[in-house]
Amino acid sequence: MMQPEKILGLIGRNIAYSRSPLIHNTACDLLALPYVYTIFNIASADLIEPAIAGARALGIAGLNVTTPYKTTVVPFLDELSPEAASIGAVNTIVNNNGHLAGYNTDIAGFAAPLRPYAQRIKGNPVSVFGNGGAALAAIEAFRIFFHPCCVYLFVRDSAKASAMLENYVHRDIVTLCLIEELFSGESGAIAKIQRSLVIVNATPIGTAGRQNETETSILPLDTELLHPDHIVYDMVYNPLFTPLIKAAKASGAATISGIEMLLGQAARSFELWTGKEMPLEQVRAVLINNLLSSP
């Protein structure tokens, strides 16, 4: 058996559910590459600096970064790619002999399945739910690739969202909106959703087994607002058919599953680390089979 020569991994909090190890280890096995991908659960933000220092010292070849640390890691890296610098969020770290470079592959990963709708999106409003790094990646992808007239960013905490946007150079395309206004029936908020061509869930709401007291619904919005002209994009990938995706299909809307972004960003990260193209369709088949067989 080939002994792993290089370590890859995912840092985040409460990430035992992640399918990233399945994706990357499958790809490495298919290509007979001497890498192993594992999970590094980081309990709190104050441990990020020593964790990054440890990765540097131990020669870990590369890392993915997920919620809630995509912005936290930035000060501890040596270099940022242009797309990571533009939103101040990193989801991929490459270790080149102790020099740590941060990238954001979420942007291209998010954009890929939306490309068939590019002409429809141009000049129309879109809505994004969330106030973390994934939401920022979606906003930047819309700006770079699709040119909507504006992005309605629906959040629960406007102060937190304002802080997130503070260093985002292109924040003028974003209009902050409160999710509570949707659920209370505020007409302006409802009109924004109805006018939006694309609706994106960039929150964990709908993730299998994750509902808690602060997420009283398994849906980010009242799905009665959905209509056949919408394109509904749920970044959640487990379950494969989330409550939002099911409701969107029932309304006649076009839908995009979270596995598309998951695989898109993973393929780019994999290429940055290994210099090889991920065997995407074979990995997709393994991932879908795993998700469908999960309880």
From Swiss-Prot:
Stored CDD domains? NAD_bind_Shikimate_DH (cd01065)
Q: Which GO terms describe its biological process?
A: amino acid biosynthetic process; aromatic amino acid family biosynthetic process; chorismate biosynthetic process; shikimate metabolic process
Keyword set includes Amino-acid biosynthesis? yes
- Pathway this chain belongs to: Metabolic intermediate biosynthesis; chorismate biosynthesis; chorismate from D-erythrose 4-phosphate and phosphoenolpyruvate: step 4/7
- Keyword Transferase assigned: no
- Per UniProt, shikimate binds at 18-20, 66, 91, 106, 237
- Keywords, alphabetical: Amino-acid biosynthesis, Aromatic amino acid biosynthesis, NADP, Oxidoreductase
Q: Which InterPro entries match?
A: Aminoacid_DH-like_N_sf, NAD(P)-bd_dom_sf, SDH_C, Shikimate_DH, Shikimate_DH-bd_N, Shikimate_DH_fam
**UniProt EC number:** 1.1.1.25
Q: How does it assemble?
A: Homodimer.
Q: According to its UniProt entry, what is the function of this protein?
A: Involved in the biosynthesis of the chorismate, which leads to the biosynthesis of aromatic amino acids. Catalyzes the reversible NADPH linked reduction of 3-dehydroshikimate (DHSA) to yield shikimate (SA).
Under what name is this protein listed?
A: Shikimate dehydrogenase (NADP(+))
Native organism: Chlorobium phaeobacteroides (strain DSM 266 / SMG 266 / 2430)
The organism's taxonomy opens as: Bacteria, Pseudomonadati, Chlorobiota, Chlorobiia, Chlorobiales
